[in-house]
Every structure is written in structure tokens, then in C-alpha cells.
């Protein structure tokens, strides 16, 4: 039974609710990015990555530019423990990368964690325990003070073990299930942990606030972060971090608003992989910054290759509409969208525009390793003349007159509608070729000869009904003479309204494409001709146009 009354708000507002953060317009500098793909992302996979796959994933994250990478919960499995030992023993961690390990606030797990990182040059030890009202009551059956003591005991042991190692250990604490925790209570636990660790500006601790399960709208989360930010002890010695999940679909907004409210670090995954609806997608966050003209400090200039590698390693398919990453995020099928994109691209080329500002495309696909020819405009029954003309021009160099573009669009859409599918670039050209280049249902031109005289004279050799016939005509020029010959023989009346031609290449051997439009009783009929000789191409175009008029009549 669909019953909304069984639910109620589970979040807690901070004691002093402020919205100072809304005065900050946008993210102008990149936060510290921490990838949690190898642990938080991996635990959500139906088939977790094996050791070799995790090593490949680690290398991918390093190449993208992550400087903090969560590696493992080393007490959770032998694979996670071995991953750490492999990275450390084989010196696979770059000097500018800090790895992170995660541990519950339980003694045997903490000790196992330090065994796993023995010999590492530097690492973040991430301590957490759940603090929400529901978990205190239902899971732990402990009071607030008892749950806080769990965190403090864990913090004491972490500090003791860190002092016994030669590694440079940084501390991180997370009040897990923060969205269901009283905000002032979460702050109290964080400050109690910091009192034990006593961080300094030169050796900061991290306080990480997770939306373990998203309960509120993002502006509420931002106000909670603002309260933590303003009241956190040792503030100049603490990096405030957020770890958003996406249960309400607001993970990206939670992260962006959280940073505006005072957070300096974001934990998440590529493509938002994670439990339930996933972690926040760090690609979306980074590219949102990039699209506003700010450097996200992560490199996604070959995002399609990254996506394919990620899919191979995780056996998870990235949704085709995933922001920035999906296969179809730059694709326009709509006719009006295609027309605007086509004109925008043409304007950009003609005016040598430096800043990116093409309708319907927020970032240049080329920046992400995509291309205009196959990724931007694709044709189905919803498409229009602009998109089809754009495809013919960018792939084949054919520049159709505006009205012919419209007619060609109708022909292509008709084929797509009848087959109930998208048309490939090659299929679109085939439609053009069939309807406007090789269209000779009534007659074909076999040959023509021009003769000198007061006016231009021509003899055409046609093939009609399997018979070869010769016809003559005169005119003020070559095209006019051929047109008059066809008019007289077929008893036609039409006006030659449009004649355009363009080269299909830049060298001397390039072919030309001629387009001709003739009108009869207000209706246009089109033909195209392609040949190395422009006269030949023009004659071919006129012959097709007359054939189409004959069919119409």
C-alpha cells in the first residue's frame, strides 16, 4: 500500500540555523578530491574487483590526478589487505599521492589496519562509528555518551599506534549516519576526537561529514555543514570534508552546497558508483567547475576511454545519460536542437570564437575525447533539416541549400520512421544518394554534345523506357540550353530557381557537388550531381530535378 503517513522527516536542523553560505556564488577553486572507488565503490559491485583489477583501477585514479585515494578496509578481507601490501611493498604509490585506509572504532580492526600499512611513507587512517539516533537505539543500544566514548577510545588507540610507526600518519574521523544524527551531538563527538588528536596547521586532521543516507534537501545539508564549519575546534588545523550519497538524487548539490558552506574536501567515486543509488559522482562535480571556466585539477580529456576502462574493471555499465560521461550526453535527436547546434557550430567557425558557447552543448565534446561527427547530431524520426545538413557537411563536405536541406530532412526522417530506428551517417548519405544523386525513374542522361552557334546549342542522348533517343535545345548558356531541351521534349513548365555548387575537397582532384532546384506551380524539386567536372555535376543535378518533377506530376 502506498502510504505516505508511515514516513516523517529524519534529519535534524542545527541549533543556530544560518544561510550565510548562499552568498557564495560558485566554486572557484577545486576542493581536495578523494576517490573512494577502491573501497566504498568496490563494496557496491555485484562482483568486487580482484587484486589485479584494483591495481589497474589505482593506476587509473593516479593518471586522472587524484592526490588522495581510499585504498581499503584492510580488516575486511584478505584481498584488501593484500592490495595494501602490494602497493607498499612494490613502491607503487607516487610521492604526491596519499593513500587512505578505513577502520571502525574497534580495537582489533584498528590494530589490523596498522599492520596493513606498515612501511607506508604516509597515509590517512580514517576512523568512523555510527552516531545516528536510529543506530544508537536499534543497533548499538547505547546512550549518546557511550557512543561518543566509542569514538574517543578509537581516537586514542589510533594516535597511540601512529606514534609507534615511522610513517607519517594523518587522522580522519567520520560520524557515520550523520544525516540522522543531532547536529550539535555530531559536533560534540568531532570536537572530542580532535581534543585527543590535537591537530596543528602543519599536520591537519580531517573531519568528514557523510550523508550516509540522504535525508534532506541540499540546502539543509549545507546549513548543517555551515554550523560544523563555524563551531569546529582547531578550525585552522582541520580539513572539513563531505562524503555525499545520492539517495534523493541530490549528491552533486550536497557536495557543491557543502563546499560553499565551508567544506574543503570531497569524497566520492567516478560515475557515482556506490551502495544503493551511489556516491557522489566526482566527474560531474569536476566538470561542473570546468564548464564555468575553473580548473578542477582532475584530467578527463579522454573521458570516453576512462568510461570504457571503468566498465571493464567493474562490470558496471555507465548510464548513457550520465552527466558528461554517458554515451549520449552530447547527442541531439530533436530537429530544433540540431538546427541550433548546427548554426552555433557554423557561427563559431566563421567568427573564430574563443569561448565555448554553442546552444544545447554545455562543454566542448572534444575536450572530453569525443567528436562532433558521431557524438553530437544523430538522426531519427524526430530529427530535422539542420542536423541532417550538418552531418552531410561535416562528414562529406556537401553543403545543401536551405530549402533542399529541408526536403532531404523529410526523406531521411521518413526512412527512420519506417524502420523505427536511428540512421547511421552512412545511411543518411545513402538516402541523399538514392533520392537526389541517382534518382532516374523516368529517364537517364547518357551523353550530351554542345554545338557552336548564335546561341548555345546542345544535343542530349537519353535512355527512356529502354530506348535511346536524341533531343535538341538552345539557350543563352549551357545549363539553359539543356533545360530548354528537357522542357520541350517532356512538355514541362518550370523555373530554375536555385543553383549552387561546392567543392568536396581542397586539392585539384576534388569532386564538386552541384545542387539545382526547379519550381513548378509553387513547389520545389531538387537534384544533385557529383563529378570532378562542374559542368558534368550541374547537368546531372538538373536531370535528377526534372525526374523528381516528372514523378510528382
Curated annotation (Swiss-Prot):
Q: Which GO terms describe its cellular component?
A: cytoplasm
Co-factor requirement: Mg(2+)
Which SMART domains does the protein's record reference? LeuA_dimer
Q: Where is this region: Regulatory domain?
A: 439-553
Query: Which pathway is it part of?
Result: Amino-acid biosynthesis; L-leucine biosynthesis; L-leucine from 3-methyl-2-oxobutanoate: step 1/4
What does the record give under GO molecular function? 2-isopropylmalate synthase activity; acetyl-CoA C-acetyltransferase activity; magnesium ion binding
Q: Which terms are listed as keywords in the entry?
A: Amino-acid biosynthesis, Branched-chain amino acid biosynthesis, Cytoplasm, Leucine biosynthesis, Magnesium, Metal-binding, Transferase
Q: What is its main location?
A: cytoplasm
The GO annotation for biological process reads: L-leucine biosynthetic process
Residues where Mg(2+) binds: 40, 243, 245, 279
State which Enzyme Commission number(s) the record gives.
2.3.3.13
InterPro entries assigned to the protein according to its UniProt record, in alphabetical order: 2-isopropylmalate_synth_dimer, AIPM/Hcit_synth_CS, Aldolase_TIM, IPM_Synthase, LeuA-like_post-cat, LeuA_allosteric_dom_sf, LeuA_N_DRE-TIM, PYR_CT
Catalytic activity, per the record?
Answer: 3-methyl-2-oxobutanoate + acetyl-CoA + H2O = (2S)-2-isopropylmalate + CoA + H(+)
Where does the Pyruvate carboxyltransferase domain lie? 31-304
Locations listed in the record: Cytoplasm
Subunit details for this protein? Homodimer.
Write down the HAMAP family for this protein, in alphabetical order.
LeuA_type2 (MF_00572)
Which family does the record assign? Answer: Belongs to the alpha-IPM synthase/homocitrate synthase family. LeuA type 2 subfamily.
Q: What does this protein do?
A: Catalyzes the condensation of the acetyl group of acetyl-CoA with 3-methyl-2-oxobutanoate (2-ketoisovalerate) to form 3-carboxy-3-hydroxy-4-methylpentanoate (2-isopropylmalate).
**Can you say what this protein is called?**
2-isopropylmalate synthase
